[in-house]
């Protein structure tokens, strides 16, 4: 689409740090509009990992062997996000894990797109999970591995949902997202 900003989908997986198990970034994946992986690394967070959250995060102690240090990964990721429309689900958590203020970015968040929720017949809900949106609109079952979530799979799902939202907007004559300012 000519005159449009480049779009990238992001998903992060977190582990618990310290005695209070505060979230720390342990994996980040970025995909382009076609679902091709632009970035996918395990990241060594700052602080002591006290809970790998493996059932959800998919991260194990073995993944931390040779993992990219947080400070290095953060710079790599932010460089890839710069100037792009960032797509994701509940992105505030991903940006918090990156220790980055998301107000400086243009974002599209599937967790707040009521138009998408209506299309999935979920507009009565207070919150909608990525898993449910994917089942309803993509007819795909995600996040069902016993090994935890895949941030690549989740990023691809949010990108596909973004594309559905764009088609709904076009069909209804609503402004499309990602148009350059």
Swiss-Prot record:
Catalytic reaction equation(s): Exonucleolytic cleavage in the 3'- to 5'-direction to yield nucleoside 5'-phosphates
Tissue: Highly expressed in peripheral blood leukocytes, spleen, thymus, colon and lung. Up regulated by E2 in estrogen receptor-positive breast cancer lines.
Subcellular location(s) per record: Nucleus; Nucleus, Nucleolus; Cytoplasm; Nucleus, Cajal body
pH-activity relationship: Optimum pH is 7.0.
Any Gene Ontology CC annotation: cytoplasm
Entry EC number(s): 3.1.13.1
Molecular function terms from GO: 3'-5'-RNA exonuclease activity; exonuclease activity; exoribonuclease II activity; metal ion binding; single-stranded DNA 3'-5' DNA exonuclease activity; U1 snRNA binding; U2 snRNA binding; U3 snoRNA binding
Single GO biological process annotation from the record: innate immune response
Cofactor: Mn(2+)
Stated name of the protein: Interferon-stimulated gene 20 kDa protein
Source species: Homo sapiens (Human)
């Amino acid at each position: 689409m000519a005159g449009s900003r480049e779009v990238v989908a992001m998903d992060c997986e977190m582990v618990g740090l310290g005695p209070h198990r505060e979230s720390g970034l342990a994996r980040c994946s970025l995909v382009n509009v076609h679902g091709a992986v632009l970035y996918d690394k395990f990241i060594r967070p700052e602080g002591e990992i006290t809970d790998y959250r493996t059932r959800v995060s998919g991260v194990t102690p073995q993944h931390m062997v040779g993992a990219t240090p947080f400070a290095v990964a953060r710079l790599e990721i932010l460089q890839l996000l710069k100037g792009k429309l960032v797509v994701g689900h509940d992105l505030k958590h991903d940006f918090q894990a990156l220790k980055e203020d998301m107000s400086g970015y243009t974002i599209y968040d599937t967790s707040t797109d009521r138009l998408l929720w209506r299309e999935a017949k979920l507009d009565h809900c207070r919150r909608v999970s990525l898993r449910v949106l994917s089942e309803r609109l993509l007819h795909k079952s995600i996040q069902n591995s016993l090994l935890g979530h895949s941030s690549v799979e989740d990023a691809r799902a949010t990108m596909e949902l973004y594309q559905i939202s764009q088609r709904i907007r076009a069909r209804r004559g609503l402004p499309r997202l990602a148009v350059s300012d």
